[in-house]
A protein has these predicted regions:
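Active-site-adjacent loops and short helices of periplasmic peptidoglycan-processing enzymes
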Residues: 1-114, 121-127
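Domain-terminus/edge residues, biased toward the C-terminal soluble/receptor-binding domains
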Residues: 93-94, 105-223
Length: 223
């Protein structure tokens, strides 16, 4: 599923942590990621609040932040993955198995569109999740690489009024891409007191137009 996994990671962190807790980034957190994968430029030894880590996770899709948050909550990524699977089962997911907090390629890390919709539905009921996920850009606290505090920007184009694919009513969601998963996209939109969740998996550059088509159909035909 790639980085849409991070919706579940964020939900668990929000349920387990205070936003002001401090997270220390280990060598493993920072460097145990695929080369060239999404990052917020956080380095070994940096210390950030859970809040800043969540903004890095959900806006910049930072894999080092996913690792650090998982270890902060559970002591290891493996233990955190157990929490992820337990939470998914509790939400009614039946076709998923999560093996890491970031969504990077792993043959034992998989989900379904329906399961991701269930996870997203739970996440958008959390006010802090909505605040973080709906933010356009955010300035992180100072780190080694960015002593003035770096900025992270939301990758989800349907939430950005300046993008051609902006969708009126869209208020939350997450992008994802890996070579194995293709383009993945979770989007939540609200219109006339109805909220719809669209999930596109293994997209091939049409994930935004596919999501628009799903929303247009849903809002036209359901009430």
């Amino acid at each position: 599923p790639a980085s849409i996994t991070k919706i579940l990671t964020a939900l668990i962190v929000l349920e387990q942590c205070d936003l002001n807790e401090m997270v220390t980034f280990s060598h493993d957190d920072v460097y145990n990621v695929e080369a060239g994968s999404s990052s917020a430029g956080i380095d070994e030894g940096d210390v950030l609040t859970v809040r800043d880590c969540l903004y890095a996770l959900m806006l910049a899709s930072a894999n080092e932040s996913a690792n650090a948050l998982a270890c902060h909550v559970s002591g290891s990524r493996e233990a955190f993955a157990q929490l992820m699977n337990e939470k998914a089962r509790n939400l009614g997911c039946t076709g998923s198995h999560f093996n890491n907090p970031s969504g990077l390629n792993d043959e034992n890390h998989y989900t379904t569109a329906h399961d991701m919709a269930l996870i997203a539905r739970a996440a958008i009921q959390n006010p802090e999740f909505l605040t973080i996920n709906g933010t356009r850009s955010y300035q992180l606290a100072p780190t080694k690489r960015t002593p003035e505090g770096g900025y992270v920007a939301n990758h989800h184009k349907m939430l950005n009024k300046n993008e051609a694919v902006y969708y009126p009513g869209a208020f939350a969601g997450k992008t994802g891409y890996t070579s194995l998963a293709g383009n993945t996209l979770v989007t939540c939109a609200r219109k006339n007191d109805m909220t719809l969740i669209a999930v596109v998996l293994n997209g091939h550059q049409s994930h935004y137009s596919d999501t628009k088509a799903l929303f247009d159909f849903g809002f036209r035909n359901f009430q």
